[in-house]
Amino acid sequence: MWIVWKLSKGLRLSRMLQSFTLLLMLCVFAFTYFYYTTDERSDYQHYQYLTRNLHNSSVGYLVWNSKCHMLSVNPYDPSIRQFVKKETFEPCSTKPKLTTINRQANGSIHLTVDQDAAKRYVKLSCCWAAISRPTTANEFFLDMDSRISAGPCQDFKDRVVLDKKDVQVLLVTCRDGKAKVIYKNTHSVINPKRARQRLLNKSSSSSMKNKKALSVLMLGLDSVSRLNFHRTMPAACAYFAERGWIELRGYNKMGDNTFPNLMAILTGQNETTSNLRCDAKLPYTLDHCPMIWYNFRDVGYATAYAEDQAGISTFNNVKAGFMKPPTDYYLRPYILASEKLLPTRQRFNCKHCTGPELSVDRIFNAALDFSEAFVGRPSFGFFWSNSISHESMNGPSLYDARFVAKLRAMDDAGVMNDSMVVVLSDHGMRYGDIRDTFVGWYEERLPFFYIWLPEWFRRRNPDAYAALLVNQDRLTSPYDVYETLRDVLQRAGGQAPISTGCPLCSSLFKPTSMERGCRDAGISPHWCTCVGFESYNKSDPIVSEGASQFVEYVNNLTERYKTSLGLRLCSILSLKRIIRVKKLLDYDNLRPTDKVLKLFYLLELTPGGGKFEITMDYRPPGIHIIREEQVSRINLYGHDAICLDKGYKKYCQCRINIAHSILKWF
């Protein structure tokens, strides 16, 4: 009897434990749901929770060492699901293109009319005109890099042989009969003869002779984070995995926008250093920048650079651009002609279609054309697209299949056997609703980066390939990419200076230190994803003092902008609210005796509603240190800053009467 009672009691106890366990699981689920669906708790608080509870574990991190705790975040985190959607592809024209540029087997280049497409029309007549930029450099014209002119339109019927014609861009116009224009399009012409003689002369005298040089092809999509690339371009991700490309999972940007991040890649310099030699705010100083493509050209490489959206391109957005073409094949005149001389269609606040073609297609078709033209000869190509991704987090989803098709075409043409191919971005989305979440903060700082090395290079350089495999899970930065380009250049017999922006950075063909932090990689704490956050009391006087000092800092900067009568162009701003403040844990610089307190603010100012993230140092007693490179605006200023054509536009809310008088002219 006692045994039966004992068993019965044990059974009841077991059931009680099961019920308690079930109740506990329900409580945990409810807490987790609340945790993720409450605005504040769903992002920074969650991050704070992880950094505290996984303090001594590498589980859940992309990079983990004593200096860097870089979280692995779910691309479909609940806090951002509402912002994610798939965009549909829409062709720019339902009709086939009437004309194409064709490279014949013997190398001859033809402008050709598609005879099948031409059958749609009874009396088709076409002519072509050469498009060119000014041939004489003139420093007094501040828009040299945005000027184009068209030559006379020359009639043709079936084709034009372009071999002996010095033309890089042309405009085709076709009519059905004598009056009605039924087709207009622009074409870029990559004629190897333009660079061939120079390349032959260089090759015969350089140390590259008898060496197999590795070509370089860089393909960029603006404003695409690593996580967003996985969300929007799964077919491309699958292609990269299938073909054996290497993804740098710990690639962290070093600056705010496109310009500093690409300058770090192309010159190895930070903004402060590059401004000493080539301040882009001054006319044509970019011509004196030590872009690494010049070093590749000097050692015998053909060079090319192209970027769509001429008004916001890297070297022309509130900048004068280049007085002289910086590369052998400089496609800005082609993009200008496409945007100015053809009908355009807007999408994502960009010129999505120019004539019958997608703007992004023009860039990557040019990349294919250039790299294919120089298969077997060393080349350096830099091709960048803004049109589908600069203003839209979801825009790349419409291009996924087409992008894979471009990559396969390059592979079929032999480009992948010749070239180190890098597919990358500069940063994630810098504006929009997603930036109010922690995941948005995180994604902005971690752009995607994939790299391909030909089989022959892997065989000849097993240590370089092994190092690259190691580096895919370590902290890397744009300065490491510059050092990698410098490494490729040196292997071809060329030289370039080491990175001044990050003297400790090294080529990706060498293993980076396992114990590496953002300071080692040339990344400031403001942009660093190796950091952690802790709660901080908003009511602490230190917080309000810091916010007030930031407002004063902003107003002092904008005070310099005045009308001819001495009136302020920008409104005096004040603090609207402290949205968030956290204590920033910089694991690269944590010392028990350090009295410096790092605070990470999200502030909203008024008028205008500008939202700013600031990483601010506080040193007792009462010293708040604000650095310009530690401030970022996370919502668009748009026409709010229309009274300024350059300078600190992100801080300027134009005074209403001044802004209205300017807008009347648009």
What kind of region is each of these model predictions?
Residues 489, 493-666:
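Phosphate/adenylate-binding glycine loop and adjacent helical scaffold
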Residues 318-326, 415-418, 422-468, 494-524:
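Histidine-centered active-site microenvironments of extracellular/periplasmic hydrolases
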Residues 16-20, 25, 42-45, 73, ...:
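A long, amphipathic alpha-helix that forms part
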